């Protein structure tokens, strides 16, 4: 019975399954997936379809899920004059921006699903949380996809807006909480300044950064919060 977190799978189904095998994931365990399951790689929706069968996997919203949800909702609709009118400049700009960050692979995969599978994907995305706060083995953790933009120690987590949680990474040189760990993804650890091990989990200043670059030729990383053991989908 253990608690794990992984993040930024970006369609790497084999990496996802490799981690589950390594940790011998079972019904007594808990796994948090900290956003950006989708895009860049080809099998993000395949991962979601597997995740939704496992009630002990808890998904957290990332910026790629946000972009996908806005556009996939429209792709589910029958094309009529009324909803064609919804294609304003803002929507088209959002679609193009999503495609520019790897969304085309998700669109292609979505088109291959049947109607029920597509609807189940949209329903599942609506269940994603914005953050999680948990205690494991006496340590407290805040799990959020990108960070806590406009951070203030006295500000309740519930007061943060969506855009403050999924777009901007924290300052990894700064301690945000003296008494808990801030667990994030979003920013590949290879670009964290002075990180001695690119594409590996970065732990410093009460931060745990989990994006090991799966969307950019790196790997999927996973950490066990009970003992801080690390697992990787590749031997980099």
Over which residues does each language-model region extend?
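Active-site neighborhood of divalent metal-dependent phosphoester bond hydrolases
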Residues: 44-48, 53-132
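Acidic, His/Gly-enriched loop-helix segments that form or flank divalent-metal centers
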Residues: 97-209, 213-218, 228-229, 233-234
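Residue-level marker for buried hydrophobic side chains located in beta-strands
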Residues: 5, 31-33, 59-60, 142, ...
């Amino acid at each position: 019975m253990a608690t794990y977190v992984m993040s930024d799978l970006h369609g790497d189904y084999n990496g996802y399954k490799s981690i589950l095998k390594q940790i011998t994931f079972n019904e007594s365990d808990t796994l948090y997936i900290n956003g950006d399951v989708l895009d860049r790689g080809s099998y993000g929706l395949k991962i979601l379809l597997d995740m939704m069968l496992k009630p002990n996997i808890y998904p957290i919203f990332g910026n790629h899920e946000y972009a996908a949800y806005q556009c996939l909702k429209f792709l589910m609709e029958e094309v009529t004059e009324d909803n064609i009118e919804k294609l304003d400049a803002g929507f088209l700009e959002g679609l193009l921006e999503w495609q520019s960050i790897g969304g085309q692979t998700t669109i292609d995969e979505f088109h291959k699903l049947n109607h029920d599978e597509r609807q189940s994907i949209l329903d599942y995305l609506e269940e994603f949380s914005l953050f999680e706060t948990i205690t494991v083995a006496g340590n407290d953790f805040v799990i959020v996809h990108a960070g806590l933009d406009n951070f203030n120690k006295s500000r309740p987590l519930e007061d943060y807006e969506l855009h403050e949680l999924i777009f901007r990474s924290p300052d990894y040189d700064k301690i945000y909480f003296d008494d808990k760990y801030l667990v994030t993804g979003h920013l590949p650890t290879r670009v964290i300044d002075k990180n001695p091990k690119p594409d590996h989990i970065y732990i410093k200043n009460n931060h745990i950064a989990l994006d090991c670059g799966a969307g950019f030729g790196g790997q999927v990383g996973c950490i066990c919060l009970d003992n801080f053991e690390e697992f990787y989908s590749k031997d980099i």
